[in-house]
């Protein structure tokens, strides 16, 4: 298990790109298509085609369909299409337990039809699922068309489900493929998840892995929403979230934030607007810091102003009374003459003290007599 799973106290890695039914999340299309296939199988309608962009969950859907059907269904699953129609028939014959005497298409198809008749007579059905069908050649598509023609009355002897990327429809829409297109009983398309669906999908996978959605912070969720503002596919979502968790782990964080998501988009080469969101967050943080600095400066200036105001408070009545008793005349800027007889110091000491006091208080222009400071 990856170290980030332990770091975030997860029991499982939540965003591995493997078709694990444990993490399956039905965002709407899957349930509809599974219901469509089930109904088609019951009614024997025949050929169903499902397309969708890369990573939209087609393979996961096929795995879920395999798990849906009981043992009475003869299920044949192909991870990718064969190179040609002959290989297709030989593969089906082998899966049905047949040993054709010849590899000629006519004889192989005869044996396949016989086996399918036996299956249907037993009250069973056969379903063939072919993944990555967009890789099919026109020869293989025509081989599928011939298989779809195998019928017993109004009942199709074999049910066919083709899963492929949108390129499959480009092939089907060609003029020469009209006979094939006319035989499609149901055509479905897996679309991208909406932004709301993306967030629910991520939450679901985190919870299945034993985690809490709080592992992604508010800015992290917002960045993910921006990254998938036009929708997302399971594969891309898994890749981005897996890398975001890994980035946060490398930075020893307890939760994924917008910067981690942005770093993940950079590592994946995704072009999103997350960068602009980061710039906005940085600007808000800078403004908040500037506002705090202004507040701190205002507090300091207020304290300094209050201190200066306290230093300029008028003398108390007792000091004024004492001053007036010594010098009844109004005090101006001049330093009053003090009789030396009252000072118990030498002439030199007196002069030094008086001059120092005079110089000090003339500079500050304080209206207070030196005698009060010497007393």
What are the residue ranges of the model-derived segments?
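A short, basic N-terminal segment
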Residues: 1-44, 299
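Conserved NTP-binding/hydrolysis module of P-loop NTPases
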Residues: 10-13, 17, 74, 84-102
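Walker A/P-loop nucleotide-binding motif
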Residues: 44-64
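Short regulatory helix/loop adjacent to the ATP-binding pocket of P-loop NTPases
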Residues: 66-68, 168-183
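Conserved AAA+ ATPase "SRH/arginine-finger" region at the nucleotide-binding site
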Residues: 78-82, 172, 185-198
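Short conserved motifs of the RecA-like P-loop NTPase core
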Residues: 106-113, 125, 201, 213-228
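Conserved Walker B catalytic segment
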Residues: 114, 121-162, 174-176
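C-terminal alpha-helical "lid" subdomain
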Residues: 209, 213-375
């Amino acid at each position: 298990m990856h170290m980030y799973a332990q770091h975030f106290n997860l029991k499982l890695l939540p965003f591995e790109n493997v078709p694990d039914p444990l993490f399956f999340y039905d965002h709407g299309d899957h349930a509809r298509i599974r219901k469509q296939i089930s109904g088609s199988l019951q009614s024997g309608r025949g050929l169903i085609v499902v397309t969708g962009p890369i990573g939209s969950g087609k393979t996961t859907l096929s795995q879920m369909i395999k798990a849906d059907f009981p043992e009475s269904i003869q299920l044949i699953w192909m991870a990718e299409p064969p190179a040609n129609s002959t290989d297709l028939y030989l593969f089906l014959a082998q899966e049905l337990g047949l040993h054709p005497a010849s590899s000629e298409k006519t004889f192989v198809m005869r044996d396949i039809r016989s086996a399918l008749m036996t299956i249907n007579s037993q009250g069973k059905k056969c379903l063939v699922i072919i993944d990555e069908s967009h890789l099919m050649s026109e020869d293989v598509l025509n081989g599928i068309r011939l298989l779809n023609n195998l019928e017993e009355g109004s009942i199709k002897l074999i049910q066919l489900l083709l899963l492929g990327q949108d390129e499959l429809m480009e092939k089907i829409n060609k003029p020469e493929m009209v006979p094939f297109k006319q035989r499609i009983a149901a055509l479905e398309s897996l679309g991208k998840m909406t932004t709301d669906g993306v967030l629910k999908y991520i939450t679901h996978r985190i919870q299945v892995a034993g985690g809490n959605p709080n592992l992604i912070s508010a800015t992290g969720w917002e960045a993910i929403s921006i990254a998938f503002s036009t929708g997302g596919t399971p594969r891309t979502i898994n890749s981005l979230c897996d890398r975001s968790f890994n980035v946060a782990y490398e930075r020893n964080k307890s939760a994924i934030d917008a910067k981690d998501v942005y770093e993940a988009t950079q590592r994946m080469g995704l072009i999103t607007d997350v960068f602009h969101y980061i710039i906005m967050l940085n600007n808000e943080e800078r403004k908040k810091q500037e506002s705090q600095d202004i507040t701190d400066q205002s507090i300091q200036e207020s304290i300094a102003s209050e201190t200066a105001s306290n230093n300029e408070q008028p003398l108390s009545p007792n000091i004024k009374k004492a001053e007036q008793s010594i010098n009844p005349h109004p005090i101006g800027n001049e330093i009053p003459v003090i009789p030396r007889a009252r000072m118990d110091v030498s002439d030199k000491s007196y002069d030094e003290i008086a001059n120092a006091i005079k110089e000090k208080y003339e500079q500050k222009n304080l209206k207070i007599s030196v005698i009060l400071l010497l007393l």
